[in-house]
């Protein structure tokens, strides 16, 4: 059974989350340092963006700022990068894109500045290459000038081959920012059938990638890729994401879904964002960007490895044992697969949360401590519930009219006898309904005890 440590910090965290739930937000904003909590609150109050979207975008931005500079180690040989695949789900006009623009602005500014530097360096390079070697030597220039590379964090639509080249030039990491995620996964088969999807499956696990370019003498070798993905998707096209092999190969299970309970259209107001809020956010991300890191003899980043304190590791193991019991009781393989991916994500969350606290001066980054683990558990529970909600939507989309009518008529909690009666009133035989009920445990329904069930999304 899960036990929670009682301390002043955890009490404050609970109070913060309770106040947020009263406003219709389920995202556990308390996982962030107080400085970032204030940024989220001010952006929400000023622009009326859903808090879930703002918080998820900020979580991703911090992960991207860390990139390959730090890793979390749970035990010898098991290390995790802060790679996130996040989808913001909502109706058209639900302000999904604007929170992303706010969170990613420090990277946009950095990329713009670096592009200016690159353009000047490229012009100089082209000028030198137009000279002969003798002319370069006579002018005191290098005889064999090196072609400049563009430093960046953000990418949009790009092929795996092009992405590998960009990543080779930016080894600390990248972020694929897709305003419409549907364009991302619909392009998976545009060149080689399934190869792009396999590329992203490998990247998620930070597996070494090798890209063999046409007409090139050498391959692009990325020892430890770091590419996070974030974007938006409309609720009505979620089923597109689950098409093909993306359900069976576990691709969809790697995506963290953010779907606010309240999706009202934002009301305009006269409130202005305090001038220091954007600057505070820039300062936090800039602290991550400007971190120094070691390079080995081959020019590869030597990341700082964060271990867990003993009490933090003990708490994490306790949570995992309880989570494993959920898996053992679960009869739906799709749900089990989701739970298994969350066991990977919780370690990544620990790394991101610890570094977020460090940027705000609330802790050091020598170890991952107990408070960070407690907060990572809350975040994992949030994404677990979101994943179950998405599975429920996917299953509802696949229902025929008879099945949908029965689901709609079932009360939030029901007995087998009640359900069979409703099914028969709608023309479904008892045996057919029993099979339908059993097939959808964990997606549409939850078994409370023998003969008693509840709807996952009443």
Locations of regions flagged by a protein language model:
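Phosphate-handling catalytic cores of nucleic-acid transaction enzymes
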Residues: 2-458
């Amino acid at each position: 059974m899960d036990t929670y440590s009682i301390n002043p910090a955890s009490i404050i965290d609970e109070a913060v989350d309770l106040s947020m739930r009263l406003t219709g937000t389920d995202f556990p904003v308390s996982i962030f340092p107080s400085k970032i909590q204030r940024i989220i609150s001010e952006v929400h109050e000023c622009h009326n963006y859903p808090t879930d979207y703002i918080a998820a975008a900020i979580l991703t931005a911090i992960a991207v700022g860390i990139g390959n500079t730090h890793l979390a180690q749970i035990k010898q040989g098991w290390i995790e990068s802060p790679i996130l695949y996040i989808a913001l789900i909502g109706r058209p006009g639900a302000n999904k894109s604007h929170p992303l623009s706010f969170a990613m602005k420090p990277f946009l500014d950095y990329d713009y500045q670096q592009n200016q530097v690159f353009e000047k360096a490229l012009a100089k390079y082209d000028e030198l290459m137009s000279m002969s070697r003798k002319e370069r030597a006579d002018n005191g220039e290098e005889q064999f000038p090196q072609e400049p590379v563009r430093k960046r964090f953000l990418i949009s639509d790009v092929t795996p081959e092009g992405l590998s080249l960009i990543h080779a030039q930016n080894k600390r990491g990248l972020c694929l920012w897709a305003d419409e995620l549907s364009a991302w996964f619909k392009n998976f088969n545009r060149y080689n059938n399934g190869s792009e999807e396999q590329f992203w499956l490998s990247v998620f696990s930070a597996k070494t990638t090798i890209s063999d370019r046409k007409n090139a003498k050498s391959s692009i070798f990325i020892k430890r890729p770091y590419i996070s993905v974030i974007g938006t998707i409309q609720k009505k096209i979620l089923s597109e994401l689950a098409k093909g092999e993306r359900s069976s190969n576990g691709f969809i299970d790697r995506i963290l879904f953010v779907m606010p309970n309240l999706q009202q259209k934002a009301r305009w107001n006269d409130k202005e964002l305090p001038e220091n809020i954007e600057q505070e956010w820039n300062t936090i991300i800039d602290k991550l960007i400007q971190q120094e890191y070691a390079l080995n003899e081959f020019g590869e980043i030597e990341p700082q490895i964060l271990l867990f304190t003993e009490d933090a590791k003990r708490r994490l193991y306790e949570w995992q044992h309880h989570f494993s019991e959920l898996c053992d009781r679960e009869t739906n393989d799709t749900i089990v697969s989701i739970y298994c991916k969350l066991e990977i994500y919780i370690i990544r969350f620990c790394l991101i949360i610890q570094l977020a606290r460090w940027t705000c001066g609330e802790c050091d980054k020598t170890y991952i401590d107990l408070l960070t683990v407690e907060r990572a558990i809350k975040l994992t529970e949030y994404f677990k519930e979101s994943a179950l909600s998405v599975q429920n939507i996917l299953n509802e989309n696949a229902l025929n009219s008879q099945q949908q009518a029965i689901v709609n008529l079932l009360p939030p909690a029901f007995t087998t006898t009640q359900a069979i009666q409703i099914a028969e009133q709608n023309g479904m035989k008892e045996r057919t309904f029993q099979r339908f009920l059993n097939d959808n445990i964990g997606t549409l329904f939850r078994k409370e005890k023998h003969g008693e069930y509840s709807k996952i999304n009443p």
